[in-house]
């Protein structure tokens, strides 16, 4: 029997932690997590990492906000179950196929926000917009994130593997 919080279908990635801000009254702390993803549609489970940050922050009652500044990623809450993750990836491919035409990738038409080294990633931007979740806020009670029995916090890479960031802000209500 697996333990309730054991990772099943998602990746746990190596991260570098940077404390960006801590209020003088210890009412809030903000962290940046730096990490590398490996592949398109990779699910990275950050539940334990976020819980550890909350535990070390000494915030008993408040909230945590997790945010990513990347338009080709998503933060979602769901089960860490291989079947679900495979279903999610399959449906995402059906809705936004990799081999479709994306005007974003058409350099003969596009004139805005262009870079020489840019990825061909129109589908990744569309997928990110459909999912529409680059941040989540959750309550913290007794120094624990309030999540359902099977819920996990995922960072989902919708583009190719590369360096990414998550920002975590923990606020105390006391």
Where do the language-model regions lie?
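Active-site histidine-anchored catalytic micro-motif
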Residues: 2-174
């Amino acid at each position: 029997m697996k333990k309730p919080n054991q990772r099943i279908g998602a990746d746990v990635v190596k991260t570098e932690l940077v404390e960006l801000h801590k209020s003088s009254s210890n009412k809030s702390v903000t962290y940046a997590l730096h990490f590398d993803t490996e592949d398109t549609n990779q699910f990275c489970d950050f539940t334990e990492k976020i819980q550890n940050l909350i535990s070390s922050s000494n915030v008993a009652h408040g909230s945590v906000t997790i945010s990513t500044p990347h338009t080709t990623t998503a933060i979602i809450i769901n089960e860490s179950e291989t079947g679900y993750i495979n279903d999610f990836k399959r449906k995402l491919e059906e809705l936004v196929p990799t081999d479709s035409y994306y005007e974003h990738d058409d350099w003969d038409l596009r004139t805005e926000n262009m870079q020489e080294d840019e990825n061909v990633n129109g589908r990744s931007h569309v997928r990110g917009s459909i999912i529409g979740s680059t941040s989540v806020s959750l309550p913290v009670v007794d120094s624990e994130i309030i999540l359902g029995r099977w819920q996990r916090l995922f960072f989902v890479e919708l583009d190719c593997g590369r360096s990414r960031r998550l920002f975590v802000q923990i606020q105390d209500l006391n």
